[in-house]
């Protein structure tokens, strides 16, 4: 951690919110932020209770704002609401009825603009389609779709009838999909024939077929959206075309009153122990927290066109493409494609075409834009932009400066946000009209979030000292459980730092520091999770995929710094006795991992080795491998290393 602290400590630049922006913002000054933060900290139940009453529609008011039995939280106990109703129905009685809810553009250039009234109709029809196939409240529904409107429609239809959804990123392989279907015990899968990415049609239905062939006995039906028009196999009695099933349904489907603590969705995130974690989020607290963070952090106004470039397969897409913006009655942009050699300026074209005002993307995308050069964005009119955001990983100060100068024209505040799948919503962030920003810092906690930097004993560290980022008090959108594995929930998030006197600390797994001005600087993961392009991938999943190859005896995977993706995957591989290392075998292993997990987990480099550095108890010392992969000197304690000659062999490659 010391290197990271050293380099970031040199950052002294400070950018005040533009006066014109502050004058119109929800929170207009540092003083207002401090008052808001103080009010939330002194009486969180009153703070969140008042906001829940003002901002959301409830079928039945709660009896208790918070029931906190550490580490288990229940918010708005006894209250009933429906997030689909809050995202749709309540807007239909206002002028927003005919406002654009979703502006969608496909990679080939096709597009749709869907109003709130139209979206409500399609969601109701699809909710009835789900019911016609026997989906009931509490049944899990898996969604494996490209970035098309049907992804949002499906999520809202599931939440309308109380069926928790589990969205699986379309880049995951059949094997990874099957693991998630089995763990969630999904009753139904919604997929497409395929999607478009980087000028190629990507097959999805055939991956679902493979996953089901390998065994996911809970799945009874599959609904298929026709996107690429590819030929796909349809299994009679199990598979149904969306375009045949949905339009024949009634557009009348009242939103079910849902208990505040009923499960809204399961979203799988990588862990260091191999099996992906099914993060459970519930309804009321998540609805409120994503609503408020969207409103205040993006300073969202009714006239704004808002675009978050994430995929709905990740938490950012759940919270800040679908639920947060639509609950606020916003116009949210969905784009199927990504910048690619044939169209490096596609993002800037979307901004120019639709007059996007708020743009939220990942540092890895910004690094790619920098490589493409300034001429590409400079050829477009980006003057509609008034706020920029970053998400997924810490952004380095120079990328921040480029983003501010080239994309924001030097006038747009940047909200550099830190949060996780488990937190449900943004935790550390500037409020753009109130908090001066420092390039590379996610600045301060959102009102109601009590964050601290501590050592492993839970003691706060001094200013500018690196430590572990923890959250000290419950918040409405916090993870409720790991699906089917409460022991893992306790161990992963609440027992890294032992509770003292009943004080439980949520362990984020990130290293961080706080400077003399109280600004937080997140320094990256402290566990064995690799952050590639803002996506957290478990080392154990990748290692398991490598070892499943018949010629591989053992594998260890680490991250090494990468200018474009933040971290790249570096694999150390030991082969079976008579297997010979070769460039051909490296290519075969890369292909194998891609098939097992997906292209996102493809190793950037593979190094063959006879042995791996291990402790005397047989644990691989990944810390040493990280140093080797990054070309750094080995430092720190190596006393537990079983065979010291291993390091020399690895250095020689």
UniProtKB/Swiss-Prot annotation:
Entry-linked PROSITE patterns: AMP_BINDING
Q: Name the Gene Ontology biological process terms.
A: acetyl-CoA biosynthetic process; acetyl-CoA biosynthetic process from acetate
Its Enzyme Commission number?
6.2.1.1
Recount the PTM note. Acetylated. Deacetylation by the SIR2-homolog deacetylase activates the enzyme.
Function statement: Catalyzes the conversion of acetate into acetyl-CoA (AcCoA), an essential intermediate at the junction of anabolic and catabolic pathways. AcsA undergoes a two-step reaction. In the first half reaction, AcsA combines acetate with ATP to form acetyl-adenylate (AcAMP) intermediate. In the second half reaction, it can then transfer the acetyl group from AcAMP to the sulfhydryl group of CoA, forming the product AcCoA.
Tree of life domain = Bacteria
Family statement: Belongs to the ATP-dependent AMP-binding enzyme family.
Enzyme class comes to ligase
Please list the reactions this protein catalyses.
acetate + ATP + CoA = acetyl-CoA + AMP + diphosphate
Q: Which residues carry this modification: N6-acetyllysine?
A: 619
Please list the residues that bind Mg(2+). 547, 549, 552
Q: Which GO terms describe its molecular function?
A: acetate-CoA ligase activity; AMP binding; ATP binding; metal ion binding
Question: Mind telling me which InterPro entries this protein's record contains?
Answer: Ac_CoA_lig (IPR011904), ACAS_N (IPR032387), AMP-bd_C (IPR025110), AMP-bd_C_sf (IPR045851), AMP-binding_CS (IPR020845), AMP-dep_synth/lig_dom (IPR000873), ANL_N_sf (IPR042099)
| Protein known as | Acetyl-coenzyme A synthetase
Spell out the SUPFAM superfamilies in the cross-references. Answer: Acetyl-CoA synthetase-like
Cofactor(s) needed, names only, are:
Mg(2+)
- The residues that hold ATP are 392-394, 416-421, 510, 525, 536
Q: Which GO terms describe its cellular component?
A: cytosol
Q: Which positions in this protein are listed as binding CoA?
A: 197-200, 316, 533
């Amino acid at each position: 951690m010391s290197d990271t602290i050293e380099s970031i400590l040199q950052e002294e630049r400070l950018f005040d919110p533009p006066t014109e922006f502050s004058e119109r913002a929800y929170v207009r000054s540092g003083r207002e932020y401090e008052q808001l933060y103080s009010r939330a900290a002194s009486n969180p139940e009153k703070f969140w209770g008042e906001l829940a009453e003002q901002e959301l529609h409830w079928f039945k008011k709660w009896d208790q704002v918070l029931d906190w039995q550490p580490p288990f939280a229940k918010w708005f106990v006894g209250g009933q609401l429906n997030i689909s109703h809050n995202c749709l129905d309540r807007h239909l009685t206002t002028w927003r009825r005919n406002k654009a809810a979703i502006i969608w553009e496909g990679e080939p250039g096709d597009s749709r603009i869907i109003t709130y009234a139209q979206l409500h109709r399609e969601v109701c029809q699809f909710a009835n389609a789900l019911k016609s196939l026997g989906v009931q409240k509490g049944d899990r529904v898996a969604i494996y779709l490209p970035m098309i409107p049907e992804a949002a429609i499906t999520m809202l239809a599931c939440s309308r009838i109380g069926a928790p959804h589990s969205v699986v990123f379309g880049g995951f392989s059949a094997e990874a999909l099957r693991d998630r279907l089995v763990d969630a015990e999904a009753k139904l899968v919604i997929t497409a024939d395929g999607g478009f990415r980087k000028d190629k049609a990507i097959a999805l239905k055939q991956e679902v077929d493979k996953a089901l062939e390998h065994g996911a006995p809970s799945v009874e039906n599959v609904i298929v959206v026709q996107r690429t028009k590819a030929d796909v196999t349809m299994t009679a009695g199990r598979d149904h075309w969306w375009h045949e099933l949905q339009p024949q349904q009634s557009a009348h489907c009242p939103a079910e009153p849902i208990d505040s603590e009923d499960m809204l969705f399961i979203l799988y995130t990588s862990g260091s122990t191999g099996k992906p974690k099914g993060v459970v989020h519930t309804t009321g607290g998540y609805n409120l927290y994503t609503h408020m963070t969207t409103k205040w952090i993006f300073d969202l106004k009714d006239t704004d066109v808002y675009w978050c470039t994430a995929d709905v397969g990740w938490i950012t897409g759940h919270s800040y493409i679908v639920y947060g913006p639509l609950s606020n009655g916003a116009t949210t942009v969905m784009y199927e494609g990504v910048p690619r050699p044939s169209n490096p300026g596609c993002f800037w074209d979307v901004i120019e075409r639709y007059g996007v005002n708020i743009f939220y993307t990942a540092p890895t995308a910004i690094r790619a834009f920098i490589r493409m050069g300034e001429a590409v964005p400079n050829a477009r009119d980006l003057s509609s932009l008034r706020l920029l955001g970053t998400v997924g990983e810490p952004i380095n100060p120079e990328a921040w400066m480029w983003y501010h100068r080239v994309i924001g024209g030097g006038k747009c505040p940047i909200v550099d946000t830190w949060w996780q799948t488990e937190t449900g919503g943004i935790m550390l962030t500037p409020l753009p009209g109130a908090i001066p920003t420092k390039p590379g810092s996610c600045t301060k906690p959102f009102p109601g979030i009590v964050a601290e930097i501590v050592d492993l004993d839970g003691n706060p560290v001094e200013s500018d000292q690196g430590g572990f980022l923890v959250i000290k008090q419950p918040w409405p959108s916090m993870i409720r459980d790991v699906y089917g594995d409460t022991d893992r929930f306790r161990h992963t998030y609440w027992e890294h730092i032992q509770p003292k006197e009943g004080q439980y600390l949520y362990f984020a797994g990130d290293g961080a520091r706080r400077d003399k001005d109280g600004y937080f600087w997140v320094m990256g993961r402290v566990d064995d999770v690799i952050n590639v392009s803002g996506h957290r991938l478990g080392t154990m999943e990748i290692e398991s995929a490598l070892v499943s190859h018949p010629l591989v005896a053992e594998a260890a995977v680490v991250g090494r710094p990468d200018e474009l993706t933040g971290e790249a995957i570096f694999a150390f591989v030991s082969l079976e006795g008579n297997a010979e290392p070769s460039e051909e075998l490296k290519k075969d292993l890369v292909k194998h991992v891609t098939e097992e997990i997906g292209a996102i987990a493809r190793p950037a480099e593979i190094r063959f080795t006879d042995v791996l550095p291990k402790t005397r108890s047989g644990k691989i010392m990944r810390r040493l491998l990280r140093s080797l992969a990054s070309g750094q000197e080995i430092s720190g304690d190596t006393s537990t290393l079983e065979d010291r000659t291993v390091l020399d062999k690895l250095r020689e490659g």
